[in-house]
Each structure stands twice: as C-alpha cells, then as structure tokens.
Amino acid sequence: MFENNWRPQTSQEVLVARSKIITSIRNFFSRNNVLEVDLPVLSSATVSDPFITSFTVNHPLGDLYLQTSPEYLMKRLIAETKRDYYYLGKAFRADEVGRLHNPEFTILEWYRCDCDEFDLMDEITSLIHVVSKGRDCYKNVT
C-alpha cells in the first residue's frame, strides 16, 4: 500500500501560531534594545554539563558537536562587548527524546548586563504577556 510519508508532520494552524510567536518574541526584544545574534550550531567543544549529551558530527578534520545551548558563545560576546543579546534558534540534545521532547528544538535564551533577578522576572512576565496576548497559545504549539 502506498504511504503518504511526504506530507508535513505539522498542521498549517501550528505553523501560523509558531510564526506569530516567533515574530512577537523578536519584536519584543527589538523594542527593548536587545540584539539578536545568529550563532554557529557546530562547535569544536561540547557542553561541560554532565547531564546533557551532545550529538557528535564526524568531520575529516576532527569531531564537531551540535550545540546544546547558546550560553557559552553568548557569554563570550557579553564579556567582550557588555551588550544585551538574545538567541532564538535551534539547539540539539541527544538524550531528550519522547512525546514532549525532540532532540532538535527551538530555544530562546537571552542575557541582560545591568538587570537583577527581579528585573528579569518582570521582563519574563512582560514577554509572556506580549506573546500570549491572553490566548492559550502555549497549548500544543511545538
């Protein structure tokens, strides 16, 4: 029997919802003068966290690793420039597979230089409010 494996795994409704969420995140950080950075997903070093497993990519010049988080690269940027940054892009974790976990996922990570934990809590609240706009947009948008 012929299988329709070529069909997308995601509905148009989910694609539109994700696009709106991503756009609102980018607009939020742009309005707050936080610079988006596009970082490499391949690195010559892996994560130092013993509870996170990286994917290894075999390369003729040596093994490379898919990033599990943008943290290290972002902290290097901040140390050099003292500027606020965010990353919205792909990350990979080899051990996280299941109904609610995909080894490839979209991650949002940001750093503020002159904010304390209370400022960040307020910012998270504002971000969630802006992104959700009172809707249940968090449901099944993966």
Could you describe each region identified by the protein language model?
Residues 127-142:
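Metal-assisted phosphate- and nucleotidyl-transfer catalytic regions
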Residues 1-119, 129:
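Class II aminoacyl-tRNA synthetase-like tRNA-binding/catalytic domains
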